[in-house]
Swiss-Prot record:
Tissue specificity annotation: Tentacle tips.
InterPro entries per record: GFP (IPR009017), GFP-related (IPR011584)
Family to which the UniProt record says this protein belongs: Belongs to the GFP family.
Consequence recorded when altering T68A: Increases fluorescence
Keywords for this protein: Chromophore, Luminescence, Photoprotein
Summary of the function given for this chain in its UniProt record: Pigment protein that is intensely purple in color.
Post-translational events: Contains a chromophore consisting of modified amino acid residues. The chromophore is formed by autocatalytic backbone condensation between Xaa-N and Gly-(N+2), oxidation of Tyr-(N+1) to didehydrotyrosine, and formation of a double bond to the alpha-amino nitrogen of residue Tyr-(N+1). Maturation of the chromophore requires nothing other than molecular oxygen.
Any one biological process term the GO annotation gives: bioluminescence
Protein name: GFP-like non-fluorescent chromoprotein FP595
UniProt source species: Anemonia sulcata
Applied uses, from the record: Fluorescent proteins have become a useful and ubiquitous tool for making chimeric proteins, where they function as a fluorescent protein tag. Typically they tolerate N- and C-terminal fusion to a broad variety of proteins. They have been expressed in most known cell types and are used as a noninvasive fluorescent marker in living cells and organisms. They enable a wide range of applications where they have functioned as a cell lineage tracer, reporter of gene expression, or as a measure of protein-protein interactions.
Amino acid sequence: MASFLKKTMPFKTTIEGTVNGHYFKCTGKGEGNPFEGTQEMKIEVIEGGPLPFAFHILSTSCMYGSKTFIKYVSGIPDYFKQSFPEGFTWERTTTYEDGGFLTAHQDTSLDGDCLVYKVKILGNNFPADGPVMQNKAGRWEPATEIVYEVDGVLRGQSLMALKCPGGRHLTCHLHTTYRSKKPASALKMPGFHFEDHRIEIMEEVEKGKCYKQYEAAVGRYCDAAPSKLGHN
């Protein structure tokens, strides 16, 4: 994997789909350090803008889905970096507490020295008077995903909270399946672990049309609460 990924890696993404029937298409470019788990990108809405909903519901597919950029500690095998040069895919369902539902599929590949992401989105049932469709979301709180192996692929589950006006939070559950394009026999699979993510929309460059985003991510065991039985 070291020969394919550098300390600074550029990436580009295409995200398209519909939310409550509204079609959109976004493109983005950025770079980051895969081994330190940090990345920044700029995303532009090239069709369907300005977005009539909060961009936040797409931002998790931009970066929370950019799994190459995670700093793993405690010797955890890096499933995603091992997957190159072939790459990997993931499928995710996100269920919001107000009834909103979003599905996403992402393909990660390597084109020369550049990571390429292609994302398809389908969002439905977001209430017209809710913070998503009213575009009143504030920020994502930091979140932790639990990650574990099932039949040669990785599964992830997490609870995320979107800060809204008045001190409220809109929560959502994410269920994701990660699939390497390499056979499981060619990979060293990680055990049960946690991945901490912090996603920040740094700037809305043009309202509903252009955003700058940052993420930091760390993969870890439960080291802060050590096991007396020697478990990770």
